[in-house]
């Protein structure tokens, strides 16, 4: 066997094995599993500090998962202010409509899901500053 073929087999083996290791972030299509958007809304609904209105999900941009004490899901999303008032309304993805012509933020939430306990925990939530932009048909 030539050196090139042997090297190629080693590289392919490492790639195949590393994708199965716990702790490695794996990409998923955002529309494959409806739970991804549920977890995005769960993360968004917890953000009430220094806000008068809840934000709501505009677009779920990307999803990655990592197996560590359950499964961590890294959700990258575009969010903007909704019509629901904090302290008056309860957050609901069905009732909290996106306000018109409001700036949006790019946010990343890490949600931990423990399927054996049916438990979801928000581990982190970070956003960019609010910016105005053209609302695309995503």
Swiss-Prot record:
InterPro entries: Cystatin_dom, Cystatin_sf. Induction: Up-regulated following blood feeding. Pfam families: Cystatin. Residues 32-116 form the Cystatin domain. Its main location: secreted. Disulfide bonds join 84-96, 107-127. Salivary gland. Residues 1-20 form the signal peptide. It comes from the Eukaryota. Keywords: Disulfide bond, Glycoprotein, Protease inhibitor, Secreted, Signal, Thiol protease inhibitor. Decreases symptoms in mouse model of mannan-induced psoriasis-like inflammation by modulating immune responses. Inhibitor of cysteine proteinases. Inhibits host cathepsin C (CTSC) and L (CTSL). Suppresses IL2, IL4, IL9 and IFN-gamma (IFNG) production by different host T-cell populations. Reduces IL6 and IL9 production by host mast cells. Decreases nitric oxide (NO) production by host macrophages. Decreases dendritic cell-dependent antigen-induced proliferation of host CD4 T-cell. Impairs host leukocyte recruitment in vitro and in vivo. Probably decreases apoptosis in host cells. This is Iristatin. The lineage of its organism: Eukaryota, Metazoa, Ecdysozoa, Arthropoda, Chelicerata.
């Amino acid at each position: 066997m030539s050196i090139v073929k042997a090297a190629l087999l080693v590289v392919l083996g490492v790639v195949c094995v590393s994708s199965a290791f716990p702790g490695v972030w794996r990409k998923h299509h955002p529309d494959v599993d409806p739970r991804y958007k549920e977890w995005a809304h769960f993360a968004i609904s917890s953000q009430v500090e220094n806000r008068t209105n809840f934000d709501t999900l505009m677009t779920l941009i990307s999803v990655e998962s990592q197996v560590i004490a359950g499964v961590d899901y890294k959700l990258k999303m575009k969010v903007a202010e909704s019509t629901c008032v904090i302290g008056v309304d309860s957050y609901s993805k069905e009732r909290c409509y996106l306000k018109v012509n409001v700036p949006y933020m790019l946010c990343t939430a890490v949600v931990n899901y423990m399927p054996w306990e049916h438990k979801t925990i928000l581990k982190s939530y970070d956003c960019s500053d609010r910016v105005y932009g053209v609302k695309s048909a995503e």
